[in-house]
Design a protein with these regions (language model features):
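Cysteine-based protein phosphatase catalytic domain of the PTP/DSP
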Residues: 1-170
Length: 170
């Protein structure tokens, strides 16, 4: 999906993807940013890519490639929260779309998407819902658009624990 070498762009039809940089999170994220737990992101690589096509403006893409979450497996909630912190920092004030995808696009992706959505809902639902209730609510909502999201009980538990942690820190 992306080139491995900055000197060899990847071409697919009219599209060209060029690698600008590829760095581990601890080199890409500033160490003085208190909102990002860099130590939790040793399995995260951050790539800067540019997508171009003839007669079109180039699109800059920042890819976060996290290899520390096994397929169908749960993840300690602290890692999901650290990933979300890194995403927030790298997005800054931009309103560009956030794309999330794992191998099948539903288990790990769905868990992260639901955590992201729950974070947006927290100010409204903070005192009326438990972490598990919000996890069930966001999962049911996301499954309308991405069937099978949050594939395993372990992923649901991870999601509920991450949401509960967000509630406690709000």
């Amino acid at each position: 999906y992306w080139p491995n070498d900055s000197n060899q762009p990847l071409k697919a039809g009219k599209w060209t993807v060029s690698l600008i940089s590829e760095l581990p999170a601890h080199e890409e994220l500033p160490h003085d940013v208190h909102d990002v737990d860099i130590d939790r992101l040793s399995d995260l690589t951050i790539r800067r890519l540019v997508l171009t096509a003839p007669n079109a403006s180039p699109h800059e893409i920042t890819q976060l490639h996290f290899l520390g979450w096994k397929d169908h497996g749960p993840l300690e909630p602290i890692y999901i929260l650290a990933l979300m912190q890194a995403i927030r920092f790298l997005r800054g004030k931009r309103c560009s779309p956030l794309w999330v995808h794992c191998s099948a696009g539903i288990g790990r992706s769905g868990t992260l998407i639901c955590a992201w959505l729950a974070q947006q809902l927290l100010p409204k639902k903070l005192h009326v819902s438990s972490g598990l209730e919000l996890a069930a609510y966001t999962t049911a909502y996301v499954r309308q658009y991405r069937a099978g999201s949050v594939q395993t009980p372990g992923q649901m538990l991870t999601l509920a624990m991450a949401i509960e942690s967000m509630r406690q820190n709000s």
